[in-house]
């Protein structure tokens, strides 16, 4: 009798275990759809993608091609109407394609808006001279002959500030800094900015208007970079990266001053800017653990 009762108890326990297992399996198969979608990567906002494809609907108020409010009314900054956000949005799109989704996607709008911030009169416009938006890699000076501020120094400073802020847990502040930094990265990829050619002594404004109008013709093949670009970003100091980019930009100064070669100069400048901004953001991401 004792053996029979033990067998009955064991059989009952096995049945209960089977029922529980069945419930678990049913629960897994009937898991709500949101439990799957919650794990899906966050894509870039549609507006960022639209800007990268040439939409004029940019984030924020933007910055005018010519700063008519400027007391001097002579200087024009490097990132104008749509060009800066076009460059940054393409960099973010490429990073998403090559490295996958990250917090940069959810903060993409902020980065895009802050890339225009330094061009808004009164923010970081150097009393209307925009001197700190220039950087000649051969002299290390801006158009006023000063070693500081320059586009290189500001891009480096914002990079370090972004790293420190992110590591301290201030994600939004870090994205603000990296956004502002990308402005100067783009500036020093523009031939006039890398040659200290202002709107007073050159065709600076005319060339930038041309580039802004034709920006959608200047793209990165496949919206992707090879591993060598990312390896270079990881293994090159920020300052050295910016110096090299400015050297390449300065080499295009002659072409950028000749209307017959505007298109070639614009194409190379914008492509180089997208690449350098991508490397700048990627290096930041690697240093703080985003990638």
Regions found by a protein language model. Give the residues of each.
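Short, Lys/Arg-enriched N-terminal segments with co-localized hydrophobic residues
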Residues: 1-11
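N-terminal, motif-rich segments that launch catalysis or mediate targeting to/interaction with membranes
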Residues: 34-176, 191-291
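Intrinsic disorder/low-complexity segments enriched in polar/small residues
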Residues: 7-9, 17, 41, 47
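Sec-dependent N-terminal signal peptides of Gram-positive bacterial secreted proteins and lipoproteins
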Residues: 15-35
């Amino acid at each position: 009798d004792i053996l029979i009762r033990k067998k009955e108890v064991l059989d009952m326990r096995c049945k209960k275990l089977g029922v529980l297992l069945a419930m678990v399996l049913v629960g897994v198969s009937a898991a709500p759809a949101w439990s799957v979608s919650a794990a899906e990567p966050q894509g870039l906002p549609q507006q960022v993608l639209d800007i990268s494809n040439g939409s004029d609907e940019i984030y924020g108020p933007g910055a005018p091609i010519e700063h008519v409010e400027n007391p001097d009314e002579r200087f024009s900054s490097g990132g104008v109407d749509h060009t800066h956000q076009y460059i940054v949005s393409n960099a973010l799109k490429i990073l998403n394609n090559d490295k996958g989704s990250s917090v940069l996607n959810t903060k993409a709008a902020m980065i895009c808006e802050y890339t225009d911030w330094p061009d808004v009169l009164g923010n970081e416009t150097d009393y209307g001279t925009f001197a700190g938006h220039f950087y000649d890699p051969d002299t290390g000076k801006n158009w006023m002959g000063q070693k500081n501020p320059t586009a290189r120094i500001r891009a480096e400073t914002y990079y370090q500030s972004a790293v420190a802020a992110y590591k301290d847990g201030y994600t939004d502040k870090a994205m603000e800094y990296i956004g502002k930094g990308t402005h100067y990265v783009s500036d020093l990829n523009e031939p006039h900015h890398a040659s200290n050619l202002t709107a007073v002594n050159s065709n600076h404004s005319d060339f930038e208007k041309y580039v802004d109008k034709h920006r959608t013709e200047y793209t990165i093949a496949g919206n992707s970079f090879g591993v060598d670009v990312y390896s270079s970003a990881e293994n090159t100091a920020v300052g050295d990266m910016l110096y090299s980019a400015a050297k390449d930009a300065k080499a295009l100064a002659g072409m950028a001053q000749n209307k017959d070669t505007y298109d070639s100069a614009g194409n190379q400048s914008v492509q180089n800017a997208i690449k350098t901004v991508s490397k700048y953001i990627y290096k930041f991401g690697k240093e703080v653990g985003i990638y």
